Amino acid sequence: MIDFLKLPSPCYVLDETLLDRNLAVIDRVRRESGAEIIVALKACAMWSIFPELARHSDGATASSAAEARLVFEEYGKPAHTYAPVYTDRNIDEILRCSDHITFNSVAQFERFGPMALLRGISCGLRINPQYSPVETDLYNPCVPGSRLGVTADELNDLPAGIDGLHFHVLCESRPHHLKLALEAVEKHFGQYLDRIGWLNMGGGHLM
């Protein structure tokens, strides 16, 4: 039992019992579904436990150059990077620290994708399946006019060099929300699914 009165303040306290319980859930989902689980740092960026997280996952995501560097240097694996914006100032660091990069649009891929492909990085495209259970428009990536992913009518064909598709429409969501999201993806993007090597279904899964 932790005596919280004896802890220095401020400090971060990690309950290893609860962590082990969560990791057991992740292990079961990986085993029974066959899916790879990629940890989002915004859920837990305590780098001192990265070795333990790495043993129970298939990598970690990054949404910025700084996060990509943290994954690369402390998680011990290149990052699966998806960022809202890529710029000439941050792209070199992102390329150095990533082995998967997802782009928001075809134009963004056309600008930075060739640089990633030259380094052997697997490139993906974020899609907008026009479904999300998120009720607050500010946080809903599928609202009309969203720049977070391409809709089916904006994608005439899968660009050469795109290995995967990525949708991120959930937030602390349950399995039935993922089912509905997958149905929307199949409806709007099903013709591309047999042409890709991976499908990133995160994040936002409450596990």
Positions of predicted regions on the chain:
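Flexible glycine/acidic-rich beta-alpha junction loops that bind and position SAM and/or redox cofactors
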Residues: 2, 133, 197-207
